[in-house]
Amino acid sequence: MSKQQIGVVGMAVMGRNLALNIESRGYTVSVFNRSREKTEEVIAENPGKKLVPYYTVQEFVESLETPRRILLMVKAGSGTDSAIDSLKPYLDKGDIIIDGGNTFFQDTIRRNRELSAEGFNFIGTGVSGGEEGALKGPSIMPGGQKEAYELVAPILKQIAAVAEDGEPCVTYIGADGAGHYVKMVHNGIEYGDMQLIAEAYALLKGGLTLSNEELAQTFTEWNEGELSSYLYDITKDIFTKKDEEGKYLVDVILDEAANKGTGKWTSQSSLDLGEPLSLITESVFPRYISSLKDQRVAASKVLSGPQAQPAGDKAEFIEKVRRALYLGKIVSYAQGFSQLRAASDEYNWELNYAEIAKIFRAGCIIRAQFLQKITDAYAQNAGIANLLLAPYFKQIADDYQQALRDVVAYAVQNGIRVPTFSAAIAYYDSYRSAVLPANLIQAQRDYFGAHTYKRTDKEGVFHTEWLE
């Protein structure tokens, strides 16, 4: 009896669609789900596909060619550990487990270490693109043993999204948790992109009272230029979508934005690494405060503040917001890639930043035209400390910073909330400052805690008895 070339565990929408994607490239696929009903449902809904169902773990594992290639698409956390534990009794040394879930990178490092000690290969793989991407071609970020990656690379390259230049959006990221770390930072950048867009929406509504149709037209025009990206493309559609009663749907959606925790993970890691991920971290908090709906409604009746006044010339203000958005986006990506560099140094991953930007160009949620600019910047100078220093981005900062300053000033004066726009200009001004007021903070630390300090005019480390 012939054996299947790869197996997929987990038949929720992402696992199901990845299995169908793999099958559509000519591979035979074994499928398994903890509940028999889910597996039967997938088979019934996809007649004629080369998906072979199995209803016990042992039969599933034994149905695969060796070395076995098993893709896990199960709930991250304890669910992943349980799935691995159920597979291990039937695996042979050299078999490969691929975790395609939204897994915390430290868990991937642990699993890689544990499974390697038992003779198994483990590839922690970030997958971005949602359910449509899983079916038609996602961006894929695999990390783990390089030799194990080579055994699954042919499949991953065939199922990945394809950029405009014909390159598949998959590359070997690095050892152990590197793939899931890059996916985590991708998600943090996604948070930043979405919050910047939300703030632009608030500015255009508050400052110009644009209608939904005008907002859609504005985003359509923006999507044809520097800001061209998946998120701008879907946002223009959102503005004009109506419900069955003829109401604009976005206007009746409750203003509470949920989250799955991946933005928080990115921010927590930045603190561990000492990285100033201010814009991306600032994009997490608005989701939290949005969930305080009852408190906000009550506070709106008690706390005073300015009412938004007209922002002036319509075309001029729209262009200022566009420029502020683009520079804010650049700052967000500069912070994200700076954190990737810090993590690469900390965990010895030897990340290739140009390649990472390349695989974000299609398939994933943050896919955007300007990612090619990031690839170009690292291709020209792989060791650049910060993307803001690359010639293209430096020129944009020169040309667009006044618009960002004007937009933030207008927003503050008119009570419009722009935390990520504000974080963008604060980071930019801090990063370009040769001197910061941190000298006073260090003096305070020495005063109350004898933490010592360095001087600008002398070598050495000093402590002062401040009360003498």
From Swiss-Prot:
NADP(+) binds at G10, M11, A12, V13, M14, G15, N33, R34, S35, V74, K75, A76, N102. It catalyses: 6-phospho-D-gluconate + NADP(+) = D-ribulose 5-phosphate + CO2 + NADPH. InterPro entries: 6-PGluconate_DH-like_C_sf, 6PGD_dom2, 6PGDH_C, 6PGDH_Gnd/GntZ, 6PGDH_NADP-bd, 6PGdom_BS, NAD(P)-bd_dom_sf, Pgluconate_DH. Its EC number is 1.1.1.44. Keywords: Gluconate utilization, NADP, Oxidoreductase, Pentose shunt. GO terms for biological process: D-gluconate metabolic process; organic acid catabolic process; pentose-phosphate shunt. Substrate binds at N102, S128, G129, G130, H186, N187, Y191, K260, R287, R445, H451. One of its GO terms (molecular function) is NADP binding. It holds the Pfam family NAD_binding_2. The active site is at K183 (proton acceptor), E190 (proton donor). Pathway: Carbohydrate degradation; pentose phosphate pathway; D-ribulose 5-phosphate from D-glucose 6-phosphate (oxidative stage): step 3/3. NCBIfam families: gnd, PRK09287.1. Homodimer. Catalyzes the oxidative decarboxylation of 6-phosphogluconate to ribulose 5-phosphate and CO(2), with concomitant reduction of NADP to NADPH. Belongs to the 6-phosphogluconate dehydrogenase family. This is 6-phosphogluconate dehydrogenase, decarboxylating. It comes from Escherichia coli. The gene is gnd.
